[in-house]
């Protein structure tokens, strides 16, 4: 299964319209750098995802984890429209959009 991949500008527009952006990276990765308004929901606990009536957009660092786990993410979305941020936070940053960086946090494990 694959989920539709969205460009950063599409994700930004959908967030403004009420979509939920979910960062499936581990907590340490999210603490180090994150997209504003993204909620951390590590992949390891994705089955405990809170329900959301609107669209859900998942992201990771590069897009590999979201695409590899697309079926699992769609199941966790419980019928909500589900998408992925193509290229993950790397694409978001490369498009010139801001991220929140906390240099005090240790470097993430998934490098």
Residue ranges of predicted features:
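Rhodanese-like catalytic fold shared by cysteine-dependent sulfurtransferases
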Residues: 1-20, 24-56, 64-111
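Short, surface-exposed ligand- or partner-binding patches at beta-edge/loop junctions that are enriched
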Residues: 59
